[in-house]
């Protein structure tokens, strides 16, 4: 049985093209994926992300629990509302999921995890929470709308109450605050400014309509994917999964090695991988010739020593902002500044870059 979010009627009203996204009927676009992409880069767009899973954790030992569960360290969160991004790993060091954790009280944290991984995530979290006496509460009664773009905050301000505007004033990136009925966070998946707004389901359609009335354009999953790829943000299931180490997924920055006695799940495996130095890495690829880089395409190059090497594209697409094709690729660590990709039986040269292409409207390549 396919699931729908509470905003489903709003999508149909706007003429959205709906697709099955991991068991959810979601809008892929509202007419033009390209226009929706540019809308976010130049103005403001909004996404229904109510399919994401919100999990609240409470208990006296919740901090110690999360220090065990996550590769990043929640001890870094010293101010209420601050958030961090982390991988949740298997004992072998593979990525079960990537998620955001909000520090909302001494005994209260909130996680936002991916929808496609909901069941395994909840089972894993609940299993390990038992040892710490932590209560795990999924919040399916909450919807979520991401408002993203250079003008997103200004347009959202017209919809917020005076109390809500006061609560978010001057809020830095990666913070969240409960303001009235809304939980408003300065997070996103586009590389632009904006908010992710958690709202009770019964108020979600009214909030969506108010944002629409104030010039925020609805955007589908198609634009969400090209925006996150331009920003160099990983997509779980494509750029990493349980077979992939965070060291091979441009997630090394999310591993808190200190304090050295914090025994998080997967630590021993990661330490061995790090010592061996043999993990591949995730890089960016840019192709200015015609054609589109796609997930699964092999990437080949010759090392300085003349040895042939091969990697694979994990995510690829035409970049609407740059006007040519870009990709993320997992490749051996000794890759140089150029590589080759086979497109229509022809080897095409691609430039190897850092895995981020556009952030805050600025081209990085």
From Swiss-Prot:
Pfam families: GCV_T, GCV_T_C. GO terms for biological process: glycine decarboxylation via glycine cleavage system. GO terms for cellular component: cytosol; glycine cleavage complex. The glycine cleavage system catalyzes the degradation of glycine. The keyword Protease does not apply. PANTHER family: AMINOMETHYLTRANSFERASE, AMINOMETHYLTRANSFERASE, MITOCHONDRIAL. InterPro entries: GCS_T, GCS_T_bac, GCST_C, GCV_T_N, GcvT/YgfZ/DmdA, GcvT/YgfZ_C, TrmE/GcvT_dom1. It catalyses: N(6)-[(R)-S(8)-aminomethyldihydrolipoyl]-L-lysyl-[protein] + (6S)-5,6,7,8-tetrahydrofolate = N(6)-[(R)-dihydrolipoyl]-L-lysyl-[protein] + (6R)-5,10-methylene-5,6,7,8-tetrahydrofolate + NH4(+). Its EC number is 2.1.2.10. Keywords: Aminotransferase, Transferase. It comes from Aeromonas hydrophila subsp. hydrophila (strain ATCC 7966 / DSM 30187 / BCRC 13018 / CCUG 14551 / JCM 1027 / KCTC 2358 / NCIMB 9240 / NCTC 8049). The glycine cleavage system is composed of four proteins: P, T, L and H. One of its GO terms (molecular function) is transaminase activity. Belongs to the GcvT family. This is Aminomethyltransferase.
